[in-house]
């Protein structure tokens, strides 16, 4: 019985190893996106929240679908605030990442966003 418990304990400890060096904090990112959508705040304050979210997204180490999804959220916030230069810059970044990982769905979506 002791051997089984020790075996499960070892499997549990080995299975809990995380390879992420800089994990993105989703709650903080969601809070920034939520505050950037608050119409009761001034445009400058909302832009600061968006820029903070952008910094967190850029720190994510891997170019994956979650990073692209967050960049699309970022682009939408810039579009709502009529920051078209930052919108275009963010959408171009999405397109570059999508092309680098051969993600045809997000390439098409980024091209559509650039057409707006």
Predicted regions and their residues:
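A "functional boundary" signal
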Residues: 16-116
């Amino acid at each position: 019985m002791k051997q089984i418990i020790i075996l499960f304990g070892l499997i549990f400890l080995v299975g809990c190893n995380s390879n992420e060096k800089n994990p993105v904090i989703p709650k903080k990112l969601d809070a920034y996106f939520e505050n950037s959508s608050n119409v009761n705040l001034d445009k400058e304050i909302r832009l600061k929240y968006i820029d903070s979210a952008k910094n967190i997204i850029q720190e994510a180490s891997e170019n994956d679908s979650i990073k692209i999804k967050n960049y699309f959220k970022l682009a939408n916030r810039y579009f709502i605030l009529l920051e078209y230069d930052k919108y275009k810059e963010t959408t171009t970044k999405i397109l570059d990442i999508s092309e680098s990982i051969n993600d045809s769905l997000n390439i098409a979506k980024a091209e559509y966003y650039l057409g707006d």
